[in-house]
């Protein structure tokens, strides 16, 4: 048996799919949540923020009270706080959170909207959440947390990632830190160093909000002389608080807290650990932290007038630079003392922790063709960006000292020196930083110093004066700061002595007189090369000695800690024995008191029995008295009756 189907039947499912899509497009938020059941939240995952908000329905436009939970990257809402199954959820990364201005008739409504990231722009309005908070403060808190989880900038400046802000503002000129931070710091240094309670007293909230909106709108407002200094300080703190990730990244929060804990035991060790933590910061974060610490150091120099010492500034600013990812009051209270100590050290010792030699001024990208570079004026000093990976500090110093102009080849390197340089691996990954540190190029007079011919190199072997060992967790970075500083000073003295002898005492060869770029004789260069190689060996030996010194100091520290632990152990054992003895005495006393109490109870029971017996005896005596009274009355009556009979 065969089944015949009509010829006009259409098996195309596109029409049905379009009908389903149209029917879904007019669903309300609750219906969409039912159509796409929300993912079950992980109960073990700690919520970032919870609270009651009013949610506007999609079609009817009325408000419904819902309990919202911000957990991980999802925003859930429930009908009741006790419910375990959410009515809906939204995936926040890439979403947009914006505040909605209300009409004057709707005063008292604090409305904001969460728009999910979607390629279908026609359905954004259907999927967005329009929410209303009970107060302005609550709305700002929700907006801040939602924007932080969404990872999108809230505006041109506030709430934007630090690296994005710095990269964007390079079109206005080279800036190490955001323009907002520069303008606020310059204004405070000019008008606020003598202001009492700077950074501690709040500014005008409405003016702070106006300035924030102006910066977010792309404007660059300038502060006039009448602007309140406390308002500018509050604006700076607000910018630091609104960063999606703090200046000290969340991944290094525990490391900085550890530095604060080590300061109680060994401040030198804490400083070394802090140097390691600073070396792993992103370049933009390091520049901003360095700028702020130097700026705060200038503020505290006038602490006799403004009443803001290093400790006070560290307390009010540290929580804005170093904060936990989960803003739990218990976590904040636990980390506040350590943050205050670390911030105090960074402000007080900023010259050691943030040396100016580590500052890398930002310049426009270098031209690919070096021949097109503008010539540097004679007898002038400039800074040129290095493009190659940095080498060791000794290599970079020797090569830079040998050739003031790294781009001018004067001949091949000697074979032994070339092998020595090629055998040394770079200590730092060039990809770790967007911009390498800068080298100093110097144009000298016509007479070249003999250091010029000591080491010749090509364009591919550009070197820098100072190797950024500060940024790499190498063994030399573990040495004491004083040792490194002495090394660098000795090298600078050596370089100055060599340069002076070149200008004054070294005769030029005929080749150098005929050609300003010529080199001196090979014997002079060989002797100078030997001197520099010996300097390299001395520096390596110094680094080894410093490593041994660090090991010895570490061993001594461990031994002292072990002794301290043994002493504390003995003290604790003595205390435990004393407590056990006191506990036994108390227990014996309790037993004795219990026995006495039992005896008192028995005595009390016996007294009660005696009292009852006395009561019974008294009752018996009273009964006998009443009986005797009756008998006496009867006897008296019987005696009176015979007398009456005898009278007649």
From Swiss-Prot:
Name this polypeptide is given: Rho GTPase-activating protein 25
Matches recorded under CDD domains: PH_RhoGap25-like, RhoGAP_ARHGAP22_24_25
Span of domain Rho-GAP: 160-354
GO molecular function, one term: GTPase activator activity
Record PTM Phosphothreonine, positions in chain: 407
Residues modified as Phosphoserine: 363, 396, 403, 537
A GO term from the CC aspect: phagocytic cup
């Amino acid at each position: 048996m065969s089944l015949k189907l009509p010829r006009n039947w259409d098996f195309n499912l596109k029409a049905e799919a379009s009908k389903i899509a149209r029917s879904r497009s007019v669903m309300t938020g609750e219906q969409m949540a039912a159509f796409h059941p929300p993912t079950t939240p992980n109960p073990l995952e700690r919520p970032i923020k919870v609270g009651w908000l009013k949610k506007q329905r999609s079609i009817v436009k009325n408000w419904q009270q819902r309990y919202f939970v911000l957990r991980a990257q999802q925003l859930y809402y429930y009908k009741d706080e006790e419910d375990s199954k959410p009515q809906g959820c939204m995936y926040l990364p890439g979403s947009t959170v914006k505040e909605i201005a209300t009409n004057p008739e709707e005063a008292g409504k604090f409305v904001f909207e969460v728009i999910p990231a979607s390629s279908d722009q026609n359905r954004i309005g259907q999927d967005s959440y329009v929410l209303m908070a009970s107060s302005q403060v609550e709305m700002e808190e929700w907006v801040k947390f939602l924007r932080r989880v969404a990872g999108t900038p809230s505006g041109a400046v506030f709430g934007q990632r630090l690296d994005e802000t710095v990269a964007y503002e390079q079109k206005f000129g080279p800036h190490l830190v955001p323009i907002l931070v520069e303008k606020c710091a310059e204004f405070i240094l000019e008008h606020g160093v003598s202001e009492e309670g700077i950074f501690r007293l709040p500014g005008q909230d409405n003016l702070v909000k106006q300035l924030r909106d102006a910066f977010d709108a792309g404007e660059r407002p300038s502060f006039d002389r009448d602007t309140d200094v406390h308002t500018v300080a509050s604006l700076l703190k607000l910018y630091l608080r609104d960063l999606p990730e703090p200046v000290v990244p969340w991944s290094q929060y525990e490391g900085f807290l550890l530095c604060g804990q080590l300061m109680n035991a060994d401040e030198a060790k804490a400083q070394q650990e802090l140097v390691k933590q600073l070396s792993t910061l992103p370049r933009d974060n390091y520049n901003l932290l360095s700028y702020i610490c130097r700026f705060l150091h200038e503020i505290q120099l006038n602490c006799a007038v403004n009443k803001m010492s290093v400790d006070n500034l560290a307390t009010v600013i540290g929580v804005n630079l170093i904060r936990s990812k989960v803003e739990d009051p218990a976590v904040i209270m636990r980390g506040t003392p350590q943050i205050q100590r670390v911030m105090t050290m960074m402000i007080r010792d900023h010259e050691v922790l943030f040396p100016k030699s580590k500052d890398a001024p930002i310049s426009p990208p270098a031209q690919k063709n070096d021949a097109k570079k503008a010539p540097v004026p004679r007898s002038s000093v400039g800074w040129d960006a290095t493009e190659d990976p940095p080498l060791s500090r000794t290599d970079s110093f020797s090569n830079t000292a040998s050739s003031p102009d790294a781009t001018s080849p004067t001949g091949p390197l000697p074979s032994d020196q070339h092998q020595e340089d090629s055998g040394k691996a770079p200590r730092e990954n060039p990809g770790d930083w967007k911009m390498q540190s800068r080298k100093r190029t110097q144009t000298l007079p016509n007479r070249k110093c003999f250091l010029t011919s000591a080491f010749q190199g090509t364009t591919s072997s550009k070197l820098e004066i100072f190797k950024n060992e500060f940024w790499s967790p190498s063994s030399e970075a573990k040495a004491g700061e004083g040792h490194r500083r002495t090394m660098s000073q000795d090298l600078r003295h050596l370089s100055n002595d060599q340069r002076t002898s070149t200008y004054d005492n070294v005769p030029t060869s005929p080749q150098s007189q005929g050609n300003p770029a010529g080199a001196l004789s090979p014997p002079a260069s060989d002797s100078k090369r030997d001197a520099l190689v010996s300097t390299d060996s001395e520096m390596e030996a110094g680094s080894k000695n410093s490593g041994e010194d660090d090991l010895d100091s570490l061993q001594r520290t461990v031994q002292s800690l072990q002794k301290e632990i043994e002493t504390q152990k003995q003290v604790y054992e003595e205390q435990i024995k004393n407590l056990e003895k006191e506990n036994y005495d108390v227990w014996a006393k309790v037993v004795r008191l219990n026995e006495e109490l039992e005896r008192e109870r028995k005595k009390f029971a016996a007294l009660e029995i005696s009292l009852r017996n006395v009561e019974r005896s008294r009752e018996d005596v009273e009964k006998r008295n009443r009986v005797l009274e009756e008998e006496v009355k009867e006897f008296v009556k019987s005696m009176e009756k015979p007398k009456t009979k005898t009278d007649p």
